[in-house]
Amino acid sequence: MYTALADQDAILKQLLATGQRTDFGKDHNLEAVKDYQGFKQAVPIRDYELLKPYIEQIKQGRHNVLWKGRPMYFAKTSGTTSGTKYIPITKDSVDNHFNTARNAFMCYMSESGNYASAAGKMIFLSGSPELERVGDIPTGRLSGISNHLIPKYVRTNQLPTYETNCIEDWETKLDKIVDETLHQNMTMISGIPPWMQMYFDRLTARSGKKVGDLFPNFNVLVHGGVNFEPYKAKLFDSIGRQVDAIETYPASEGFIAFQDSQKEEGLLLNTNSGIFFEFVPAAEIFSESPTRLSLKEVEVGKNYALIINSNAGLWGYNIGDTVKFVSLNPYRLVVTGRIKHFISAFGEHVIGEEVEHAMLVASAQLGARIVEFTVAPKIA
């Protein structure tokens, strides 16, 4: 706990030391900021629309806009109101993405003793690694960019091949992935749950076997991107047996947290990897003057909107997620939803976490297995 708080204090100081020499830092007088209280006064919370003018300057070739130099990559995401978003990944922030994924796997192997999981073939179900250039900066989906960050010692066991990964049409790509993996010694499979389910269905359709029978040494499933629980029963039914699952919390804006233990609830917050975290009570996020809390001020069981400041050049940035701490020593959290994912046709304010919990209870009572779902208010 105390190491995490010290790390956060040190990161804020490092961010301010570099940030004050950027256009953003000069616009917000970061040179005069001495502590977190001063930081909150100088740097307002912002969404992508308020960040966009700085991103446009970077696209036009300007240096030292949000962070020193220029980004190594733009991670491209689809925004609901802002259109396509271009999130910078810098030379300083790039290690956050790969090293955190590595740390999650290392924690798993250290706790479980399952070192054999690293000896076989591993598949990362991801977007295309082919990148375009925007403002002369390599640009693509985060999962595609991540393929360029994987070191050679991991590539030896990585599937699918680069050529297959570059296929844009998902159905064609999935068939090719099945071709390449069907007779391999797969020990680890990674991806978002819906993609893994489609892969498992295609494997079973081709082989007539459960995934666990097809890959007898498969024992680790790594997932992230969406809540795992609604998909869990169907995925394990497709596998045909239990395997260990490692949950991760990657985002284009940074690798936020990862499951460091198979025995404890929640994901370990990534407190020493170039991100200074802030938390806003979820009910206040759309107010004009929301309460902003540092890590040492959070409480267990309360819903917070997650705000990040990072060496990617993100400042007071609202990534749109809500989280809830389940432990403060160490700092472990669960993702409870998106700040805009709620239904309130009659002022009921039903959030994503509540919908998912209700679905889990209902599916358990009815013996149902959920593959995918959509929720919306229907007023007759």
Which residues are covered by each model-predicted region?
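Conserved pre-ATP/AMP-binding loop-to-beta segment of ANL
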Residues: 59-75
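Conserved beta-strand scaffold positions in the cores of enzyme catalytic domains, especially
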Residues: 86, 122-124, 245
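Active-site glycine/GP-rich loop and adjacent strand/helix microenvironment
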Residues: 1-31, 39-46, 53-61, 145-380
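Conserved structural elements of the adenylate-forming
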Residues: 89-111
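Conserved AMP-binding loop of ANL adenylate-forming enzymes
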Residues: 108-152
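Short, glycine/acidic-rich hinge or "gate" loops at secondary-structure transitions
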Residues: 28-34, 116-119
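Conserved adenylation A10 loop of the ANL superfamily
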Residues: 74-88
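Short, solvent-exposed loop/turn and secondary-structure capping segments
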Residues: 87-89, 134-135, 201
